[in-house]
Amino acid sequence: MDRNPSPPPPTCGSEDEEDLGGGDRIGSTVYSKHWLFGVLSGLIQIVTPESGTSGSADEEEQADLAEEMENEICRVWDMSMDEDVALFLQEFKAPDIFMGVLAKSPCPRLREICVGILGNMACFREICESISKNEDHGQVLLQCLCDSDPPTLLETCRLLLTCLSQTEVASVWVRRIREHPSVYANVCFIMSSSTNVDLLVKVGEVVDKLFDLDEKLMLEWIRKGATRLPGQPHEDSEEQPVFSIVPCVLEAAKQVRSENLEGLDVYMRILQLLTTVDDGVQAIVQCPDTGNDTWRLLFDLVCHEFCQPDDPPVILQEQKTVLASVFSVLSAISASRAEQEHLKIEEGDLPLIDSLIRVLQNMEHCQKKPENPSESDTEEPTICGPTQDDFHMKILKDISCEFLSNIFQVLTKEKVAQGLKEGQLSKQKCSCAFQSLLPLYGPAVEDFVKVVREVDEALADDLEDSFPSVKAQT
């Protein structure tokens, strides 16, 4: 079934109409309490079969969901988005029934629907708090991350993300996840092996939220992957694999890259969060394979995919958050080049300069106000828009400028000559860069101009004439 069926008509005849006119309605809806009781009773019967009917044949039968029952429980799934229905389900202790299904039923579709209903109910604060503070419920839901059914995993992650987004109970879930060791392994397994883009995006959002909420948990997950050195053999072939968080994040990012920009944004943000702690940076750069894999993926994104020369400048509005994360991680890796000789990143300096300057050029274009106010009605008024106060655009500019200044400081005479020859550097591009870098990064600009002078004295003079503050100190 491709989608959840719509709820049925609330009445089937005159008698039903009379019932709904009385006390059978759920809140202000047209849904019937009696009908809902019947569906929930059917659920109870599914997970508590009569004695004497157990056996392999019965288990196989339980693994399949009758079409009529599936239709009815799917209607409940749709209905549970209504607050009155959700509160009624809570009052009737439906979460206990759904938890019983999750604990006992082998039917993947039924498990998916039950978690989905709980996810809808958790969108309402009172219900979310009730579900979250029940330790038994919490353990059952975390155990669902062991499920092999992608739709069930997707709904489980959606439910967890909903709960983690509620400030009143977020800490409860963080503590519970830290105490539940299988969560890390299950999440890493999904990221490293799943090809389901929707699932990868949602599990990425859960990891992103967890790392944002609790740095200690992030550090624990980073260190879990360091329990076995790269290339260390398994002494016991039956031993469970030890996952490292960075390769798992990279694999998931590669899967979602071409299909879901928002999902890629999530995984780049996870990498950026990892670089906010030294252990996270080391987890990326210490292992040659991981460091170089990370660099290659991110370098390819910014140099060959995002903000390309033939893209309209306004594309920056769509890509600003993912670009900020990518440049931030690349900058952290680049800063480790002296200590990590195995990182093969020097050849990327000139293409990165080209990409960074293009981002700054596009940013300048987006921030320009039309000379003729009437033009704003005809030339992309809402796409570009005023971005001076755009928080994310400012973050991108700050990160880009810091990264560019760092690259300028390590450029050799040979690299500058190559850049001038190949076009990554020019008077126009350098001027654009200086406008963004000065005055904050004055020393880096001064050092760069000194190197330029060794290669092209005329260009250095032109740049100093255009930017007197640089000339005064060189």
UniProtKB/Swiss-Prot annotation:
Task: Tell me where in this chain the PTM Phosphothreonine is found.
Answer: T387
Where is the protein found, in the record's own terms? Nucleus
Name positions with the PTM Phosphoserine: S6, S14
GO CC terms in record: nucleoplasm
Among Gene3D superfamilies, the record links this protein to:
Leucine-rich Repeat Variant (1.25.10.10)
BP GO annotations: positive regulation of synoviocyte proliferation
The record's keywords, sorted A to Z, are:
Nucleus, Phosphoprotein
- Say if the entry is tagged with keyword Iron-sulfur: no
Q: In which tissues is it expressed?
A: Expressed in the synovial tissue of knee joints.
Q: Which residues form a coiled coil?
A: none
Please give the residue ranges the record annotates as the region Disordered. Answer: 1-24
Where is this chain compositionally biased, Pro residues type? Answer: 1-11
Q: Which family is annotated? A: Belongs to the SAAL1 family.
The task this protein performs is described as:
Plays a role in promoting the proliferation of synovial fibroblasts in response to pro-inflammatory stimuli.
Instruction: Tell me the protein's name.
Output: Protein SAAL1
Species per Swiss-Prot/TrEMBL record: Mus musculus
